[in-house]
């Protein structure tokens, strides 16, 4: 899976499972290419969302929900993910 496919899949899965006002996903893999632990095919993503759900549940619970939604992608394709909830 390439980065564009991964971003598309992540965005789609989150949009289907969380009520969003805004979502932006950035590829930050280039910041980690020189690290010893960098693996080809594993990506670093920055996820920025604004959700009406955060009014119902706190940021920690929303973050847990995102991790559950992206479980497969985290195991196979995502080395690290930064989640910003506005």
Question: Could you tell me what each predicted segment is?
Answer:
Residues 1-86:
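N-terminal, polar/charged subdomain of small-to-medium soluble alpha/beta proteins
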């Amino acid at each position: 899976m390439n980065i564009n496919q991964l971003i598309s899949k992540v965005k789609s899965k989150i949009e289907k499972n969380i009520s969003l006002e805004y979502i932006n996903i950035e590829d930050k893999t280039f910041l980690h290419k020189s690290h010893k632990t960098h693996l080809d095919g594993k990506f670093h993503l920055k996820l920025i969302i604004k959700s009406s759900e955060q009014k119902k549940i706190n940021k920690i619970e929303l973050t847990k929900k995102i991790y559950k939604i992206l479980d497969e992608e985290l195991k196979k394709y995502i080395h690290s993910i930064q989640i910003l909830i506005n």
